[in-house]
Amino acid sequence: MDASTRLGGFKILNEVAWISVIQPKGHKFPMAFANLMASEKLNLPFLTCGEQNRAWGLHLVVDAQDEKRALGLIEKEFGDINPAITRGAILSVFPHRSRPEIVGALFDVLGKLGDQQIAFANSPSAISAVLGKDIINEATSALFGPFRFGPYRTPADWKLAQKGKEELYKEVVASYQEKKPKVYGLEWQDKQELLHVKLDGANLVNMGTVFKNFARLGLVLTFLISRPSKEKGKGNLLFCLPESEKNNYTGMIKKLLPEASTVEDSSVASFSMNGPHFGDRYGITSELLMALDQACADLLGLSCSIHSITGVLPSKQIHSAIEAIQGCFDVPSVIKREPQNLL
């Protein structure tokens, strides 16, 4: 990547509560959780859920004013599962077009802010990070190192242009709702590998370098989320790359992160949908998870952020999953993408 890469822009949603939970029991926990939030009309502008060793970990965001209500519902429904709570903001950079070098540069920027816990989700249109409120201003300024954003030459230029837009942004978050959610289309691809990497915040810069190395091979990143870890100070990244006989992904990770715990799942498929919705929008994720459950699809990971939903599951289940999605969403087109290599 060039010293400074031109992107479309970035957005920040402030005044949010970031909640992280882990449920070691119950493979239907994400569906039960999403159903609970939807029944109470609690919007989730950011949600990731990932499975590992039969335990589900979720990162989610609610409006700051809904924090107490959300926590009360969680405790009442699921008991004492010790949710972690942070006041923060969602930073979304777009478009990154599934390019690992964009993810790598963002990891590098955020990793240099110190040993911080950060939640990530990507889609074909954007990569989003949930940050603690104490580092959001520093993170915003640091973006202008590796990236250029249209007419905004400096952080001050960008901040001036954002005045008065925060309320409009919040109105879009929770005002749009339909009986059958519409999306612009569904894309999917198989022949993917799902990698699980456990690392701490201090290793984010090195993980960024790993993604830049993936980019040098011309690889396309079709799925990426983070999930919380039971180990203090650690987190888990889950991401998909094309299946490859010549590229040893685990070896590339271990070269820079020898202490990182890495697991690979082969023969998975990823899907993505873009639409006019924002985040969960009062139940989109709930409807999707119920449909996938009825189709007996073994979801491995999911994200719902900004205008996109992405997910990953075993390749052999992708067709039944697509049928389930078409049953609960208005999907005008379904497109299979072949595993891509940019070189």
Regions found by a protein language model. Name each.
Residues 1-343:
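A conserved regulatory-domain signal marking ACT and ACT-like small-molecule sensing domains
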